[in-house]
Amino acid sequence: AANEEGVVTGAELIHNPDWSSGMSSSIRLACELLSVDCDQLLVLLADQVLVSTNELETLVAMAADGGSACAGFSGTVGPPAVFSRAWYPDLLTLNAENGAKKLLTDPAKQVAIVPMKSAGWDIDSKGDLERLSDVSSYIFGN
């Protein structure tokens, strides 16, 4: 839980020295550090502010028993995504050209796709941030 200063207790902050090479380097680092201790890895982007706890819980449940689950939105798939430990070796092979999306769309892999309109909304610009005030129409179609 976050305290008044915004510090999350019970969590360890990990710095990725190779951050400039892309998100795949952060996923690889997480797999290296968590492979023994964690059954699942959640990939959630900090700017996906509309994704709910219930949606994340659904992904975790759908990825149980060695599976994987990801959001489906706007005709594509992507984060948030949950990968079970069995996927860690594949995640360790990711690079800038072959990211996690390639794994999620591989027909040989079993991936549960959870419809998640909220995952399609992220904040990439000041305009995106300003549109958050009208986000209910995006999510609920009002």
Model-assigned labels for residue ranges:
Residues 79-83, 121-123:
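Short glycine- and hydrophobic/aromatic-rich loop-to-beta-strand nucleating segment
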